[in-house]
Amino acid sequence: MAMWQGAMDNRGFQQGSFSSFRSSSSDEDLMDIPGTAMDFSMRDDVPPLDREIEEDKSYNGGGIGSSNRIMDFLEEPIPGVGTYDDFNTIDWVREKSRDRDRHREITNKSKESTWALIHSVSDAFSGWLLMLLIGLFSGSLAGLIDISAHWMTDLKEGICTGGFWFNHEHCCWNSENVTFEDTDKCPEWNSWSQLIINTDEGAFAYIVNYFMYVLWALLFAFLAVSLVKVFAPYACGSGIPEIKTILSGFIIRGYLGKWTLVIKTITLVLAVSSGLSLGKEGPLVHVACCCGNILCHRFNKYRKNEAKRREVLSAAAAAGVSVAFGAPIGGVLFSLEEVSYYFPLKTLWRSFFAALVAAFTLRSINPFGNSRLVLFYVEFHTPWHLFELVPFILLGIFGGLWGALFIRTNIAWCRKRKTTQLGKYPVIEVLIVTAITAILAFPNEYTRMSTSELISELFNDCGLLDSSKLCDYENRFNTSKGADLPDRPAGVGVYNAMWQLALALILKIVITIFTFGMKIPSGLFIPSMAVGAIAGRLLGVGMEQLAYYHHDWTIFNSWCSQGADCITPGLYAMVGAAACLGGVTRMTVSLVVIMFELTGGLEYIVPLMAAAMTSKWVADALGREGIYDAHIRLNGYPFLEAKEEFAHKTLAMDVMKPRRNDPLLTVLTQDSMTVEDVETIISETTYSGFPVVVSRESQRLVGFVLRRDLIISIENARKKQDGVVSTSIIYFTEHSPPMPPYTPPTLKLRNILDLSPFTVTDLTPMEIVVDIFRKLGLRQCLVTHNGRLLGIITKKDVLKHIAQMANQDPDSILFN
């Protein structure tokens, strides 16, 4: 990346013909930048057959080297050649080929000396060392974020006089004046009304606490949005749609940089502490990927190869989910199912190791003080019954309906934000939403507490020692019967909690729509789980009371006798949380594993699977896209979804450019164009690459050359090769013919020429073309007829065609 910057910052092209290089690669044009390129322009590219190498030792990567090397200034690699522009897509085939060549070279050298053998071993070990570092950094940052967010969330309600750095729970841990009924009240913890007016009783004290709660929330939100806007605009949002796009090969420079990491970490704490309806789990994936990208720069193997770096980012995403949920296996499956585009077996092992180290690091930090990796770890002891699958499936249906509703409304609101004046005032928008959230949340204790604490409360299986209102049942039993509590009639506290939870459900459903997508770090996992957990707890309590009062009904009498512990409302909350999260994200396997790891209950996998699958079916029936795919399409990222089938009967000739009545395809000839001719084409077009043909008359294809490589090579030749002028002939052939005396030196650029561009015929079905683009990660392919070049299909053309076939606006596939 540093080399790329150097090459870009020192362009100094002759005659001013390249002044528009940085901005000239248009997404709309023929060779659009968001595709993936078959560009074998690097010296480390796919080699010829071994026998050819033996015959000609001068092989140099782009083709067989010429014996006439006088004018071939590219015998030495040029910094910048073969690298990628911002908002460009990598060439997966070339990058993997370069890595194979590098590995082959190291293996061959390791047989020659001990030092080379040591280098080979260190190269093989470097991947595991990098995973270890990513796990350590991700776990440490997650622990720091958890501890800071917990303290700052409690700061809205009061402060610990025994040490301001203690949160509410830690402040009262060592207090000798804590009663069992009020474990959260101790003399060391003072609310703001106690500090300001010396009392915690009465209407005025309530108003003071209310005012301070709203004030702190606005302050935290203002700091978060201001830091994002001023220092790191890429630190906003969840980050998962962009991570998916980057892992598919797209380059967004700075998105995984140092500033983004620092600002995202700080503002994530502020955003979570503000009380907005958002979570830290999605942004933690972004934070972990930032750690992975930054650490990659310490290893040449990953710094110089974009495909290898994306393998590391896939593992980093697994580590991010591992520390977000305390679910290392779920993290690996999340990376495989949801975010990764290319996931070889080696990446699976390394993702597992990175997730393991990250979880171990977080467990060592113990941010919640409960020796668990998450705040809402619970264990259930009562088995579920077959009849309960019916309410579990109902929760799945609710989750699917909620997911589809949320995606449609949130995307509509985000589109309005992008297309109206609303998007120009992100600070005001954040402050308004924060003020509304805080004002509505404070009166209800279930919305006033942090969302993670709310989920923990909803998942909780009530015991004898629980003092929560959700556990305020009437005790009509003999406690000597055993540890398991029978179903009991609900008390006044439970009924009060029910209507408060119903109001909390409405608030969470509505306010999350407007919160996700604002210019602050905002995850969606926790708000979605909260919606489902509230709905599940309400249904669970209803089922529990139904079983208690009507245990003689046919549906209950076979398995639920009076005085037995039949229904676990906390389990319903967990199933509802899984259903709603699945409805929004469309995750299935990874979701079930994450929820299983959260609860430690192997026997509850079937209810979770039933709810997750039902929610996905219902949500898919109402809209095919999950929230992350919908945001990818909204932002116009060039992401070619591998899960969708292309079923239309169109041909390559229907999609390729140029079309009929369009200008002819811009091409370069292999041996008849001058430097000035090429410079003119580059300055007058915005294509990011050009086919090279034998001649304009024959249109026989020779290869493909990238615009960026051309510019850097010509610039370098003018600086380092004497006599290269505008009238110098550019050769892409293996041998340059003898030139008359006194003619300017020729410029040989064969080494930047991709000699094996991917081609299809004009009658190739588009379903095959789309499959090729997906599976090979192509950036473009050339279309031929009887060996003659006809046109070109880029990744952008494929995406536009898919949108057009789906009756969508093809111009929406424009990255902005």
From Swiss-Prot:
GO molecular function, one term: identical protein binding
Keywords per UniProt: Antiport, ATP-binding, CBS domain, Cell membrane, Chloride, Endosome, Golgi apparatus, Ion transport, Membrane, Nucleotide-binding, Repeat, Transmembrane, Transmembrane helix, Transport, Ubl conjugation
GO cellular component, one term: Golgi membrane
Motif (Selectivity filter part_3): 523-527
Amino acids binding chloride: 238, 525, 628
Annotated transmembrane regions: 125-162, 208-231, 256-275, 281-300, 348-366, 389-414, 422-442, 498-518, 523-542, 605-622
Membrane-related topology note: Multi-pass membrane protein
Compartments where located: Golgi apparatus membrane; Endosome membrane; Cell membrane
Domain CBS: 656-720, 752-812
Site (Mediates proton transfer from the protein to the inner aqueous phase): 338
Annotated motif Selectivity filter part_1, positions: 237-241
Placement of sequence motif Selectivity filter part_2: 279-283
Reaction equations catalysed: 2 chloride(in) + H(+)(out) = 2 chloride(out) + H(+)(in)
Sites where the protein binds ATP: 666, 687-689, 794-797
GO terms for biological process, alphabetical: endocytosis; renal system process
PTM comment, free text: Ubiquitinated by NEDD4L in the presence of albumin; which promotes endocytosis and proteasomal degradation.
Self-association and partners: Interacts with NEDD4 and NEDD4L.
Its biological purpose: Proton-coupled chloride transporter. Functions as antiport system and exchanges chloride ions against protons. Important for normal acidification of the endosome lumen. May play an important role in renal tubular function. The CLC channel family contains both chloride channels and proton-coupled anion transporters that exchange chloride or another anion for protons. The absence of conserved gating glutamate residues is typical for family members that function as channels.
Family according to the record: Belongs to the chloride channel (TC 2.A.49) family. ClC-5/CLCN5 subfamily.
Protein name: H(+)/Cl(-) exchange transporter 5
Species whose genome carries this gene: Oryctolagus cuniculus
